[in-house]
Amino acid sequence: MAFEENEISVNSQGGTESVKRGLAERLDPELIKDFQIICSRVRKIEEDKIRVYWLHDLPEDPETNHLKEQASRDRFHKIVYCGNWQYSRYQLVCGIPYDSQGIVIDTPIDPLPTVTKQFDKIRLVYTSTPQRGLNILVPVFEELAKKYPNIHLDVFSSFKIYGWADADKQFEPLYERIRNHPQMTYHGFAPNEEVKAHLLNAHIHAYPSIWLECNSRSVIEAMSAGLMCVHPNFGGLVDTSGGLNFMYQGDQDINKHANIFYQALDHAIQNVSSDGVQDYLKLVKVYADSRYSWSKVASQWEDLLTGLKQQYGDVNNRKVPSAKFVYNT
């Protein structure tokens, strides 16, 4: 199998796994049969294959931190990063040189259709796992709901997306607050197609992220759905959004962050239905659809793999090189 599964990914329906499986469906089986494409977690190396290491995690992750070592990097013919911010961070943390071994290929989506939205009720949505900022969103929304009876928050959030149902237990009190609030609905885990269908009727993607991430497929899909995306300028979100979303300066202090987010979300609720904002969101959608479309990204992968196959057509040229002796004074 060109696209590897491991003990963690096999039960997951997360972004990494969805993209990996989607790419496998779109590429010519004849092209990829000579490849070993590893997503983040290295388990074994196939020396007769052309090896591509596709990174979706941070360089601080123990599963990828081995890239600090030149010998580890030399095992791969190409290292693919899922975003520019992530690539820069690997250079900074792991000392990876800026050279032709690396390449950035964005995380793809299927662009969502353009729809006409109604604004009799302002619908907010959260579509990521709970540890990324749901603990800020819920109390902030509770306060805003006192001010705006016409707002509603839908929460699609659960570790079940990764096959980790037990991890939800610590967030159960938070989920219960959502279930018990008349202006909030907790959906738990839902298939991606169901989430995307809901995005088409929503107006604001409320995402007070406190979790460093390389990029955010949930944000990309919300941009494509024409939502006003409200999130901090944190981690890879600036790169993901192209600086086009309604970003704010967050704070590592949760209480300060919550107060800042309250102001940002309040502003979004007041303005999301205006003609000026709606016209601007059309531009944001064009950007997201152009940059992240599957047709573009799959073509980039096809070009990359075709070039590597030409370069390493001889199986004898694919072996892992012997470790080099480095004299340290």
Descriptions of predicted regions:
Residues 116-133, 138-141, 145, 154:
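Conserved donor-binding/catalytic core segment of Leloir-type glycosyltransferases
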Residues 200-214, 227:
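Acidic donor-binding loop of glycosyltransferase active sites
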Residues 168-193:
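Nucleotide-activated donor-binding/catalytic signature segment of Leloir-type glycosyltransferases, i.e.
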Residues 13-18, 252, 256, 273-313:
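A charged, aromatic-enriched C-terminal amphipathic alpha-helix characteristic of glycosyltransferases
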Residues 76-100, 301:
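A short, active-site helix/loop in glycosyltransferases that binds the activated sugar's phosphate group
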Residues 1-45:
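N-terminal pre-catalytic "stem/leader" segment of glycosyltransferase-like enzymes
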